[in-house]
Curated annotation (Swiss-Prot):
The lineage of its organism: Bacteria, Bacillati, Actinomycetota, Actinomycetes, Mycobacteriales. PROSITE patterns: RECA_1, RECA_2, RECA_3. Required for homologous recombination (HR) and the bypass of mutagenic DNA lesions (double strand breaks, DSB) by the SOS response. Can catalyze the hydrolysis of ATP in the presence of single-stranded DNA, the ATP-dependent uptake of single-stranded DNA by duplex DNA, and the ATP-dependent hybridization of homologous single-stranded DNAs. Numerous X-ray crystals have been resolved under different conditions which indicate the flexibility of the protein, essential to its function. It comes from Mycolicibacterium smegmatis (strain ATCC 700084 / mc(2)155) (Mycobacterium smegmatis). It comes from the Bacteria. The keyword Transport does not apply. This is Protein RecA.
Length: 349
């Protein structure tokens, strides 16, 4: 016979008290007991991408996957997040499994290379073990692993060139993510995994593209960003950068499938001013008449490049435009949810 309601409630309270005693206060709780915790974020460096993410940046304490073709801007997006985390007083680490990090380029993007923790591991196991130990220290704000494809299992490195090592990397990633996910959440560390694209052979319908490292990362990632270069930016006949499109293909903290476009300039990274012009025009703060851009009666310049240079030189105007865009769209450094707010439910695909 089932227990009476008061007895069941008392038994549940005793069980919860024992769980708190054994595993620490807050190990189990009723979801409605407290106001929903604020989602703390790290800005990406592009206001359009911050808007597409729905919360104003990359969520802290979560796994992020950034993937795309070669030279599409994956590492640039990750380094901008590192620079913004450091600018807020945070500590950042970069696991350079590809052995391709350019410190001079990172410095131009705003990364404090003197305080950046860098590791160039020999094997995939070593890379993920180092990452796990750094995360468990509780001192990190952001860690970047570049890239998943370069996390070569020890058995493959020590074996012969023609040996078959089916599924080794996938098992390695699955085990590492099982260990790291809880530690990331507890420490509030954002882990960015940069990934490469491969093509599945014999696919007749649908996209043949897939990412390396098995399926575990797709499941554990709270946000997945698909980065693509869509056109080359030119100043006259000289190529000066790329127009980049990022699609949020998975988002557990806000509705997914939104897109953002921004400029990545060679040697400079994401053009903050270019994003402000695009978003300003879209939301009516900047007026575009022919090739002229105007803000509150003041001419910014003829052509986007001149307007961008004006905002670069007049940071107060750029900051004012950014503030207005963020206020209109309701995004910022921290998104809080009041008890009475009705928020769209996060969608997990």
């Amino acid at each position: 016979m089932a227990q009476q309601a008061p007895d069941r409630e008392k038994a549940l309270e005793l069980a919860m008290a024992q769980i708190d005693k054994n595993f620490g206060k807050g190990s189990v709780m009723r979801l409605g007991e407290e106001v929903r915790q604020p989602i703390s974020v790290i800005p990406t460096g592009s206001i359009s991408l911050d808007v597409a993410l729905g919360i104003g940046g990359l969520p802290r304490g979560r796994v992020i996957e950034i993937y795309g073709p070669e030279s599409s801007g994956k590492t640039t997006v990750a380094l901008h997040a590192v620079a913004n985390a450091q600018a807020a007083g945070g500590i950042a680490a970069f696991i350079d499994a590809e052995h391709a990090l350019d410190p001079e380029y990172a410095k131009k993007l705003g990364v404090d290379t003197d305080s950046l923790l860098v590791s160039q591991p020999d094997t995939g196991e070593q890379a993920l073990e180092i990452a796990d130990m750094l995360v468990r220290s509780g001192a990190l704000d952001i860690i970047v692993i570049d890239s998943v494809a370069a996390l070569v299992p020890r058995a493959e490195i020590e074996g012969e060139m023609g040996d078959s090592h089916v599924g080794l990397q996938a098992r390695l990633m699955s085990q590492a993510l099982r260990k790291m996910t809880g530690a990331l959440n507890n420490s509030g560390t954002t882990a960015i995994f940069i990934n490469q694209l491969r093509e599945k052979i014999g696919v007749m319908f649908g996209s043949p593209e897939t990412t390396t490292g098995g399926k575990a990362l797709k499941f554990y990632a709270s946000v997945r960003l698909d980065v693509r270069r869509i056109e080359t930016l030119k100043d006259g006949t000289d190529a000066v950068g790329n127009r980049t499109r990022v699609k949020v293909v998975k988002n557990k903290v806000s509705p997914p499938f939104k897109q953002a476009e921004f400029d990545i300039l060679y040697g400079q990274g994401i053009s903050r001013e270019g994003s402000l012009i695009d978003m300003g025009v879209e939301h009516g703060f900047i007026r575009k008449s022919g090739s002229w851009f105007t803000y509150e009666g003041e001419q910014l310049g003829q052509g986007k490049e001149n307007a961008r240079k004006f905002l670069l030189e007049n940071t107060d105007v750029a900051n004012e435009i950014e503030k207005k865009i963020k206020e209109k769209l309701g995004i910022g450094a921290v998104v809080t949810a009041e008890a009475d707010d009705v928020l769209p439910a996060p969608v997990d695909f």
